[in-house]
């Protein structure tokens, strides 16, 4: 069950869940505000809580508004695309064979069948990014499992509109945003550690922060670096 409350010019979506504490989040790219509240919490208490966070909400929304956006993809020759933080110029090749993506020097060669439209080109490139992300993530999981004393049961990779990653701590699964394959490797490693830390502490509380401080002392540097990079043009914070 959910409702929407107004805080002056700001609207917040409230979702009632079987939880003990209230949580408030601001999501990119538009600064959408979402509040997760205990099932029986009074709406006036929720409003008071949200009002107490107004200054922080506005600060986060301002950061998101100032964050650079990638231009919409048109899949044209010499269009810029990124892989692990490096810029490549796109080259479209039409050939009557299985679609593929290849990196050569500073060029990304996207091979598609003759007549392929933009949707098909995007599908081929998205599938390639997913595969690159999986290949890079599995070694990181293997590295951090013994260091953190946790076990990741399954890894999922898909396009996510509001998060870099998520964790199902009960099932032991983590999910990563395909967009991470466009960012520097150290940013991916930070998100992997962040999500694996949720296997030890599922809330964003002081204990969770202490875990990040312990396992990755420079985590705030990597978080800030990631959130300062251009985000995808579509509607999609750590």
Where are these regions (language model features)?
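Active-site-proximal or metal-binding-adjacent scaffold patches in catalytic folds
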Residues: 1-190, 199-238
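Walker B catalytic acidic pair
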Residues: 195
């Amino acid at each position: 069950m959910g409702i929407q409350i107004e805080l002056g010019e700001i609207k917040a979506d409230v979702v009632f869940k079987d939880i003990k504490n209230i949580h408030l989040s601001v999501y990119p790219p538009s600064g959408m505000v979402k509040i997760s509240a205990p099932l029986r919490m009074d709406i006036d208490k929720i409003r008071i809580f949200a009002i107490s966070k107004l200054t922080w909400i506005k600060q986060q929304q301002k950061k998101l508004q100032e964050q650079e956006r990638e231009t919409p993809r048109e899949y044209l020759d010499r269009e810029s695309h990124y892989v692990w933080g490096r810029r490549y110029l796109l080259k479209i090749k039409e050939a009557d064979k299985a679609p593929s993506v290849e990196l050569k020097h500073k060029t990304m060669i996207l091979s598609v069948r003759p007549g392929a439209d933009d949707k098909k080109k995007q599908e081929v490139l998205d599938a390639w990014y997913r595969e690159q992300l999986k290949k890079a993530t599995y070694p990181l999981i293997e590295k951090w499992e013994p260091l953190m004393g946790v076990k990741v049961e399954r890894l999922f990779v898909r396009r996510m509109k509001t998060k870099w990653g998520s964790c199902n701590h009960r099932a032991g699964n983590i999910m990563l945003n395909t967009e991470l394959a466009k960012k520097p490797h150290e940013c991916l490693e930070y998100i992997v550690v962040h999500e694996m830390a949720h296997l030890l502490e599922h809330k964003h509380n002081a204990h969770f922060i202490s875990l990040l401080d312990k396992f990755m002392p420079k985590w705030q540097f990597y978080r800030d670096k990631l959130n300062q990079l251009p985000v995808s043009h579509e509607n999609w914070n750590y």
